[in-house]
Amino acid sequence: MARNTLLIDADDTLWENNIFFEKTIEHFITQLEHLGYTREYIRHILNETERRNIRQHGYGVRSFRRSLEDTYLKLAGNAARREIVQEIERMAVELEATPPHILDGVPETLAYLAKHHRLILLTKGEPAEQAGKVERSGLQSYFDAIEIVLEKDAGTYARMIEQFKIVKTHGWMVGNSPRSDINPALHAGLSAVFIPHVATWELEKCELESGGGKLLILTSFRELRTHF
């Protein structure tokens, strides 16, 4: 078996992530129902606010909290109440303190893969926040390197290829996000393993595209043992 370099995503690939954000959003929307807007409209405004704030403030709980606050203040206007802002702050603190919930089959699959391939954890987000998740996950020992980046695009993967001297024919990206994990990796000339997650963040969804490498679609992380 050829030794490959596997770049592996973290959030919603190794551990649950977006389900906790979704629970927070549902609670947030409930808090705003008294304003008279539909739940769908509140979510639409929140999504638009997140897209805007990500460009300026990046990813992570702090940016998310800002988006919740901005959405509330926009919709409430002069009727904004301090106790709602305080509740948003409380929800953000609770969200950031949530420990990683490792997905089924991940530890034993990583242990197997680490014996045969070079594993690099590639995750995006606020550096300190993501580093804390990695440490609390207890999975760091399976990886030859851990890379935390602010964004995942084709340029990011090109840098990874150069930094780690990855031979493209033996380089793979493994993840759940078409927008951040799969499409840009393929465009950079790597192959990719798409493992869909039922709760993938709305802003990470897009159509799968073709690229320079091969695309493998699996239903679970443990299936990697069959192919690698």
Predicted regions located by residue number:
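Active-site neighborhood of HAD-like aspartate-dependent phosphohydrolases
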Residues: 1-45
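Asp-based, Mg2+/Mn2+-dependent phosphohydrolase catalytic module
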Residues: 1-4, 83, 107, 111, ...
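An amphipathic alpha-helix signature
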Residues: 21-29, 65, 69, 127
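Short, surface-exposed acidic
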Residues: 33-48, 77-88, 142
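A metal-dependent, Asp-based hydrolase signature
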Residues: 49-94
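Long amphipathic N-terminal alpha/beta scaffold segment
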Residues: 87-107
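Structured helix-beta-strand junction loops
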Residues: 98, 115-116
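Conserved phosphate-coupling serine/threonine residues in phosphotransfer and NTP-handling enzymes
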Residues: 123
